[in-house]
Regions:
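Conserved ABC transporter NBD signature motif
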Residues: 67-79
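Short helical segment in ABC ATPase nucleotide-binding domains corresponding to the A-loop/adjacent helical element
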Residues: 87, 99-107, 117, 121, ...
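Hydrophobic anchor residue at the start of the ABC signature
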Residues: 150
Length: 261
């Protein structure tokens, strides 16, 4: 795929920060990556390799020190409603209910009240929180809070979902369950228009289970070590975790992450 056909295109992006001592710290090496419309791509790599930095560049929260990030062929210059972000920390407004959190984005963009209400009903039901609309974040379990965060994100109808370890804080069983929920929600949200996903995770099995491709990054300054195609058809079933190809991919990625730079 050429950059012209990509939903997201990362072209020679690098990022350097200044440390407290005034030294230049290279967090992200030159990265080139194209992501197709409707594709689900995960990034795995060692801690501090620049995964979240790359996501922040694509979200428009940070500018690259060199190179360029594009969406639909246009440079990304800042945040925008066409790109939704879901964080590990849920990032819900504690003073708003589930319904209030989901309504916040569309309402703040001036969408008509009846349309906002319709979106709230639709997306709250999609993430299976109907009946909890009047609850506040502190009244929800971790899994419910993350589903609310996802509903709030997709209520803005973004083309691209940028997800930074959204399931990392959950217990193992809840995490496995929400992986299936995430795939279901992504599929339902993509019915009218494909949603492109960039997903950051430390969990190799999660990356394989969710993704069309897995990007393996090196130690800091992070560069792409390899891009691995995931061979499993969609919809995904939990049984693929026992497939020998699943285990072979897990081993391949693990060995890449263990390898010295």
């Amino acid at each position: 795929m050429t950059a012209a056909g990509a939903k997201i295109s990362v072209q020679g992006v690098a990022k350097t920060f200044q440390s407290a001592a005034g030294d230049a710290v290279s967090a992200l090496g030159e990265v080139d990556l194209d992501i197709a419309p409707g594709e689900f791509v995960s990034i795995v790599g060692p801690s501090g390799c620049g995964k979240s930095t790359l996501l922040n560049v694509l979200a428009g929260f940070e500018e690259p020190s060199q190179g360029e990030a594009l969406m639909d062929g246009r440079p990304i210059r800042g945040p925008g409603p066409e790109r939704g972000v879901v964080f590990q920390e849920y990032a819900l407004f504690p003073w708003l209910t589930v319904a209030g959190n989901v309504a916040f984005g569309p309402a703040s963009r001036g969408i008509a009240a009846d349309e906002v209400a319709a979106r709230v009903r639709h997306y709250v039901a999609m993430v299976k929180l109907d009946g909890s609309e009047r609850k506040y974040p502190h009244e929800l379990s971790g899994g419910m809070r993350q589903r609310c965060a996802l509903a709030r994100c997709i209520a803005n109808d973004p083309d691209v979902l940028l997800m930074d370890e959204p399931l990392a804080a959950l217990d193992a069983l809840t995490r496995l369950s929400l992986q299936d929920e995430l795939l279901r929600i992504w599929s339902e949200a993509s019915r009218e228009r494909p949603k492109t996903v960039l997903y950051i995770t430390h969990a190799i099995d999660e990356a394989i289970y969710l993704s069309d491709r897995v990007v393996v990054m090196s130690e800091r300054p992070g560069r792409i070590r390899r891009v691995i195609e995931v061979p499993f058809a969609r919809p995904r079933a939990p049984e693929i975790r026992t497939d020998p190809r699943f285990h072979a991919l897990t081993d391949e990625i693990w060995l890449l992450l263990r390898r010295e730079p």
